[in-house]
Regions:
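Acidic/His- and Gly-rich active-site-bordering loop/insert found
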Residues: 2-103
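Zn-dependent metallopeptidase/amidohydrolase metal-coordination segment
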Residues: 7-11, 335, 342-355, 363, ...
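Midchain, well-structured core segments that form catalytic/ion-binding scaffolds
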Residues: 22, 102-105, 145-146, 152-365
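Active-site metal-coordination/substrate-binding segment of hydrolases
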Residues: 64-146, 151-162, 184, 313-316, ...
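Acidic, glycine-rich active-site loops and adjacent beta-strand->loop/helix elements
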Residues: 76-78, 139-147, 169-172, 211, ...
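Active-site-adjacent substrate-binding region
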Residues: 218, 225-227, 232-248, 393, ...
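His/Asp/Glu-rich mid-to-C-terminal helical/loop segments that flank catalytic regions of hydrolases
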Residues: 222-240, 270-272, 317-324, 332-335, ...
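Substrate-recognition/cap regions that form aromatic- and gly/pro-loop-enriched pockets
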Residues: 340-430
């Protein structure tokens, strides 16, 4: 990265270093080895726990020994996505970076700035001999992206710091002081396959072209849920015609708003044209309802060959009604922070699985644990009434905003002093590891900030280079102004 002459040089040096080290989620052994070697090379106390979290300690610089101990924290795994025309093995190949104007990108893959830039920043501070700071502990956690494994496994006593600064935020100039907790509620309907009539009109109906997005960050933007839209139409058909449901499929990831859903159905041949008319009317209704948020919404209906088997009508009816009943979207807004979603649920996916089962995954989020549990129980109740087997996962805790946080005041004052403007203080309706840290270390004072990233979790991931220097200057000034013990 040196040949690119990016500033701050030390941060980009280490970012390029770790871009050479493969680090997919759940396969972080190479980056763990790199961090342990780094600790030895710099003669710093280094330890790991049973899941691979790494903690590197650095003593205070002279005159700063009386400051409270600060934990700097980043996760070491990255989301591994590539364009279909790119040859790349994330287990062995380095990430190739390229400068595009003011942005740093990768060549057809995720960049890994989420959260590699946080890791690089910590390494630059650990390696520096000209930066003032109090006692430091640098925590590097594993598998944030696919299970929060490192944060879940963290044991009390592994760290000793008083203040934790999470470096996993993506908007420079914004300070985060809260996040949602979450859990998945999964329902399974077991059906009896029945013989499908051969003299019916078979058709595949699909909802496509939706915007989708993150089920936390984007849940308040009025976007449509493909599973909900498809189910609504199927329920209409079932109330008017003899409807056989043969297949149903929608959505994929628990943390994504589903963009597409489809079903294979059959109605008596005499109702063939009526179904087409119904879909045209329904599509016009949706285009009116979602004119502002879903400009590319479309429906499709295509004739299909007859199926041999269908879902029994009783189960199909219970399924459609239960999916219709479950809440989807924002449920409550925060009473503390204007504009922040407090509680929501996402009808994430509907899949047919082995054993004649239909599996439905929903995801609940809230910054208040009792509200999240209430939302999960609401979803559970609707599915139980429909005859499904329902389970709610253990979940992860939220981080309730503390507007009186001492480290927040330091960070706000520092930003105003350095840049002449007030930073935005926010919470997010998505998960951060901070909620789990607070569960294990209840007295921690926490804040999260970082440089500007866009397109994370996709090959379009990019980092705004000038914001890295601002982030760096801000972090170093915060470290100098940490309160005394």
């Amino acid at each position: 990265m040196n040949e690119k002459n990016l500033k701050p040089a030390s941060v980009f040096y280490y970012f390029e270093e770790i871009c050479q080290v493969p680090r997919p989620s759940k396969r972080e052994e190479k980056i763990i080895a790199y961090l342990k070697a780094f600790g030895r090379e710099h003669d710093l106390e280094t330890k790991t726990d049973e899941v691979g979290n790494v903690l590197i300690k650095k003593p205070a610089t002279p005159g700063k020994e009386n400051l409270k101990t600060v934990i700097l924290q980043s996760h070491i795994d990255m989301v591994c996505e590539k364009n279909s025309d790119v040859e790349h093995d994330f287990l062995i190949d380095p990430i190739e970076t390229v400068v595009d104007g003011e942005w740093l990108k990768a060549k057809g893959t995720t960049l890994g700035a989420d959260n590699g830039i946080g890791v690089a920043t910590e390494l630059a501070i650990l390696a520096a001999t000209d930066i003032e700071h109090g006692p430091l502990e640098c925590l590097f956690t594993v598998d944030e992206e696919t299970g929060l494994t490192g944060a879940f496994a963290l044991k009390p006593g592994f760290m000793t710091g008083d203040i934790l600064i999470n470096l996993d935020s993506e908007d420079e100039g914004e300070l985060f002081i809260g996040c949602a907790g979450g859990a998945n509620t999964t329902a399974e309907f077991t059906y009896q396959p029945v013989s499908a009539p051969q003299d019916y009109f078979y058709f595949r109906v699909a909802v496509k072209g939706l915007t989708g997005g993150h089920s936390g960050d984007d849940i308040n933007k009025g976007r449509a849920n493909a599973n909900k839209l498809l189910n609504r139409f199927l329920t209409q058909l079932a109330s008017k015609y003899i409807l056989y449901l043969c297949e149903i499929d929608g959505g994929n990831l628990h943390n994504a708003i589903p963009r597409e859903a489809q079903a294979l159905c059959a109605v008596p041949m005499k109702d063939k044209e009526s179904v087409r008319v119904d879909l045209n009317i329904y599509t016009a209704e949706l285009e009116n309802e979602y004119a502002a948020t879903e400009p590319n919404l479309r429906t499709e209906l295509s004739s299909e060959s007859p199926c041999k088997e269908a879902i029994d009508m009783t189960t199909a009816g219970h399924l459609l009604r239960a999916v219709y009943a479950v809440h989807n979207g924002v449920y409550a807004m925060s009473q503390d922070i204007p504009g922040l979603v407090e509680t929501s649920s996402n009808l994430a996916s509907i899949k047919q699985v082995e054993g004649n089962k239909i599996k439905i995954v929903t995801s609940q989020r809230s910054s208040i644990l009792s509200s999240r549990k209430d939302m999960s129980e609401m979803i559970r109740s609707a599915f139980l009434l429909g005859g499904a087997e329902v389970t709610t996962g253990e979940g992860y805790p939220g981080w309730k905003p503390n507007t009186d946080s001492p480290v927040l005041k330091v960070a706000v004052d520092s930003y105003k002093k350095l840049f002449g403007v007030e930073p935005k203080v926010k919470a997010i309706h998505a998960g951060l590891e901070c909620g789990l840290f607070l569960e294990k270390y209840p007295s921690l004072d926490m804040v999260s900030f970082g440089p500007t990233l866009r397109g994370v979790h996709s090959p379009d991931e990019r980092m705004l280079i000038p914001t890295v220097d601002k982030f760096w200057r801000h972090l170093l000034d915060v470290l100098v102004n940490i309160p005394t013990k």
